[in-house]
């Protein structure tokens, strides 16, 4: 944001120079990122002096050139060849001396050099208006007052404004400082802290006078929530023309291009007071009627830039009796603005809902000075005052008259905030005691009204325009930035607390698993926790009432917190596959959020998503597609790495998956995974099979903290392997057999593996064949055949009893 030093001094008459002022503003939290000199004339007329033409003779070799002798003062007389028809002896003229830099019409610099023109030496240039950037005239040189002494700097004689422009890196929360008036308020508070008491200079509105009421507008506001306050007034008999130099220079200093006296006046008040205004050509307002309302989705509207836009049903519009004229608070329409033919205007000043403006501006990809301020929240109390100030200025610049009463629709006043500050809490947070009277003075200097002061704290009223100061902590921050961070002493003691190292460190576990997944060919992703509420419509598993809704969303697509990691993973997968990434393996650590009647729930998760092949194809072999069992192997490998085993399996009953499993331990779900339902993947434009896993990371971490891990030495006695080929029902899973086996033989059974599955011919209907491998080992001795047979018989009997299994 650009702030003019000269403009700033219109509001606060400080004798501090620009450098000191910039340093104080930075200390106050308005960081000065750059300071740039500005001149209303390119180059500031540096090197231009007043010369006295002593003689003027015809050039011997050119009919249109004259050879002059010019006195530049201090006994310096130079010869200059000039082609202007009006140059004559005795004139006082502006002279660009050798080495002076001038600027052409496009702003490109060029330098005056000593040279010869048609054989005559020329040691400078006598300048016309356009050559100095003072106007457009080029039919002759400028002739100055004859009483000006030769050698006088042209910048002292001609109308040149020199200024300093601050580039302020304004943080989004400081909507109150988005104007010269707002910056001046902070500067006053900072100066008062340094015992320099200055009052703000408020633009007067005493000249506001209604000449007649011949041009009235009927204003209707359909939705008071979208437009809490709407003001307007008509001005007639205006003359559209170029703005005076003082106004053009103010706007040019902050990189605004002057347009005409009416538009420039609205821009001037916007950057002066922070209140956006809009001038409508009154003759183009059908029915002398202003309707502030929304229009149906799909309505076409052409903005000032000539772009036809399709409106959304939530876009607030300024309409007349027949048509839309302006996107409220964002951008004007192509047919409603001020032109050279305009003779009367309706001047609008309003307070629009910040959330509504932000959504509309983002939907249409627009970012204007008005929307920038409206979406951050302006001062609702300034709306009428700024209108009066701008109306007076327009009347002065255009010769117009006010021809209606001020319309002010403000049914529900926006209230100031009430905050109580505890002194002890303030001092504890600041780290140093600040006297109560100092705190009171700082608050008063920030226009925060002190209601009452007690032994324990201070009650106050925060102005509505300070929408960033709503809590006790915010008030403490305000006190601290004005008091000065540099004034807080450094304690002689260093207080520190050492975190307990007992238990599992979450970040170490996360890094361990991330490294493992990376080694397996996965890439880590990071998705937005904000998502679209429409995703809940893709599944009955997720409920719309469980959405945690954002109060001020950037867009509808980012208006709720995610209930599941799945949809962000599918967005990333779709993004990659659309860019020809055939084999995708991604993982993400993140949180999910759910809203319940009495509480909100936030849980940690780890998600995996896989599509395509297990690995890239090589020249020597073709790699198979990543299937359910490959994916299960990755998941169990992660759990094994964490020392979690002996978990049970159960099928998932969720429309998120076409098939899937949950792995559980101690009646807690560790992970749910499976093949994502095609109805969901197609919504994201993904046609291939997608595997997704959702680790309940918070549950896993809690189990790791409660599990007692026992370290044992490797046994010196051999392992023994035995196999079973079992004929079982199709409904029986390997996990069921595995868990039953470990329950049956708890001491000597070490491992159970499934190494073959057969279904098809030669088997009874509804049956399948599993080939299982059992690993047995005694830590203290070598197992005998008798012991082994006894264990295997026990397992066989248990399988027969529990599952109706038979040996093949």
Per-segment meaning from a language model:
Residues 1-211, 346, 369, 379-380, ...:
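Phosphate-backbone binding interfaces of nucleic-acid-interacting proteins
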Residues 2, 444-448, 468, 472, ...:
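A carboxyl-terminal module marker
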Residues 5, 23, 27-28, 40, ...:
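Glycine/proline-enriched, intrinsically flexible loops and inter-domain linkers
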Residues 49-80, 260, 266-335:
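Conserved mixed alpha/beta core segments that line enzyme active sites in large multi-domain catalysts
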Residues 74, 115, 291-331, 335-338, ...:
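Class II aminoacyl-tRNA synthetase-like tRNA-binding/catalytic domains
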Residues 118-133, 137-143, 154-164, 291, ...:
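Mobile "lid/hinge" segments at catalytic clefts and subdomain interfaces of large enzymes
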Residues 187, 191-221, 398-426, 433:
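Terminal amphipathic helices with adjacent charged low-complexity linkers/tails
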Residues 419-582, 775-779, 787-808:
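Extended, well-folded interaction surfaces typified by the phenylalanyl-tRNA synthetase beta subunit core
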């Amino acid at each position: 944001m650009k702030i003019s030093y000269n403009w700033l001094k219109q509001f606060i008459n400080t004798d501090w120079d620009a450098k000191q002022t910039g340093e104080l503003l930075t200390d106050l939290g308005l960081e000065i990122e750059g300071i740039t000199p500005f001149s209303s004339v390119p180059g500031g007329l540096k090197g231009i002096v007043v010369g006295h033409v002593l003689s003027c003779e015809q050039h011997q070799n050119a009919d249109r050139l004259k050879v002059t002798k010019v006195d530049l003062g201090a006994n310096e007389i130079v010869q200059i060849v000039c082609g202007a028809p009006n140059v004559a002896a005795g004139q006082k003229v502006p002279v660009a001396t050798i080495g002076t830099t001038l600027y052409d019409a496009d702003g490109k610099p060029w330098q005056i050099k000593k040279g010869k023109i048609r054989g005559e030496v020329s040691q400078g240039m006598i300048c016309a208006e356009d050559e100095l950037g003072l106007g457009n005239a080029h039919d002759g040189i400028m002739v100055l007052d004859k009483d000006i002494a030769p050698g006088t700097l042209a910048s002292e004689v001609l109308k040149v404004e020199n200024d300093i422009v601050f580039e302020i890196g304004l943080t989004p929360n400081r909507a109150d400082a988005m104007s010269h008036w707002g910056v001046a308020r902070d500067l006053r508070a900072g100066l008062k802290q340094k015992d320099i008491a200055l009052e703000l200079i408020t633009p007067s509105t005493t000249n506001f006078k209604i000449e007649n009421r011949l041009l009235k507008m009927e204003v209707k506001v359909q939705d008071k929530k979208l437009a809490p306050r709407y003001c307007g007034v008509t001005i007639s008999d205006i003359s559209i023309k170029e703005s005076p130099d003082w106004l053009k220079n103010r706007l040019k200093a902050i990189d605004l291009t002057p347009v005409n006296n009416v538009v420039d006046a609205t821009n001037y008040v916007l950057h002066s007071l922070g209140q956006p205004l809009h001038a409508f050509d009154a003759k183009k307002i059908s029915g002398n009627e202003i309707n502030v309302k929304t229009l149906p989705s799909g309505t076409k509207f052409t903005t000032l830039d000539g772009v036809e836009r399709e409106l959304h049903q939530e876009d607030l519009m300024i309409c007349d009796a027949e048509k839309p004229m302006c996107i409220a608070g964002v951008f004007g329409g192509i047919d409603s603005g001020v032109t050279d033919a305009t003779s009367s205007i309706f001047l609008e000043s309003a307070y629009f809902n910040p959330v509504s403006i932000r959504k509309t501006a983002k939907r249409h990809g627009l970012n204007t000075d008005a929307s920038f301020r409206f979406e951050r929240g302006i001062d609702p109390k300034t709306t009428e005052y700024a209108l009066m100030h701008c109306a007076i200025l327009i009347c002065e610049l255009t010769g117009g008259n006010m021809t209606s009463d001020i319309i002010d629709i403000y049914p529900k006043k926006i209230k100031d905030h009430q905050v109580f500050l505890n002194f002890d809490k303030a001092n504890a947070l600041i780290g140093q005691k600040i006297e109560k009277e100092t705190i009171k003075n700082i608050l008063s200097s920030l226009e925060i009204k002190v209601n009452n002061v007690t032994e324990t704290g201070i009650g106050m009223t925060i102005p509505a325009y300070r929408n960033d100061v709503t809590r006790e902590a915010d008030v403490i921050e305000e006190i601290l930035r004005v008091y000065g961070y540099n004034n807080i002493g450094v304690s002689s003691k260093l207080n520190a607390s050492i975190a307990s190292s007992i238990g599992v460190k979450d970040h170490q576990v996360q890094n361990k698993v991330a490294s493992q997944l990376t080694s397996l060919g996965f890439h880590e992703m990071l998705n937005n926790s904000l998502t679209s509420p429409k995703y809940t419509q893709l599944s009955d598993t997720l409920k719309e009432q469980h959405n945690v809704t954002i109060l001020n969303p950037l867009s509808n697509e980012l208006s709720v917190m995610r209930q599941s990691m799945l949809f962000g993973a599918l967005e990333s997968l779709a993004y990659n596959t659309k860019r020809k990434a055939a084999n995708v393996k991604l993982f993400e650590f993140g949180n999910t959020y759910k809203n319940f009647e009495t509480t909100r729930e936030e849980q940690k998760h780890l998600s995996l998503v896989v599509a395509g092949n297990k690995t890239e194809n090589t020249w020597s072999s073709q790699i198979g597609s990543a299937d359910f069992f490959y994916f299960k192997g990755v998941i169990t490998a992660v759990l094994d790495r964490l020392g979690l085993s002996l978990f049970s399996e159960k099928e998932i009953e969720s429309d998120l998956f076409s098939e899937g499993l949950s792995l559980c331990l101690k009646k807690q779900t560790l992970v749910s995974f499976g093949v994502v339902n095609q109805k969901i993947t197609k919504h994201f434009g993904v046609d291939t099979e997608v595997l997704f896993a959702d680790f309940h990371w918070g549950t896993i971490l809690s189990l790791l903290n409660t599990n007692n891990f026992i370290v044992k030495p490797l046994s010196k006695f051999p392992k023994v392997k035995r196999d079973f080929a079992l004929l079982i029902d199709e409904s029986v899973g390997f996990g069921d057999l595995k868990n039953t086996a470990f329950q049956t033989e708890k001491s000597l059974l070490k491992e159970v593996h499934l190494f073959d599955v057969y279904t098809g011919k030669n088997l009874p209907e509804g049956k399948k064949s599993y080939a299982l491998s059992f690993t047995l080992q005694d830590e203290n001795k070598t197992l005998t055949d008798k012991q082994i047979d006894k264990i295997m018989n026990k397992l066989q009997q248990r399988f027969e009893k529990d599952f109706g299994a038979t040996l093949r």
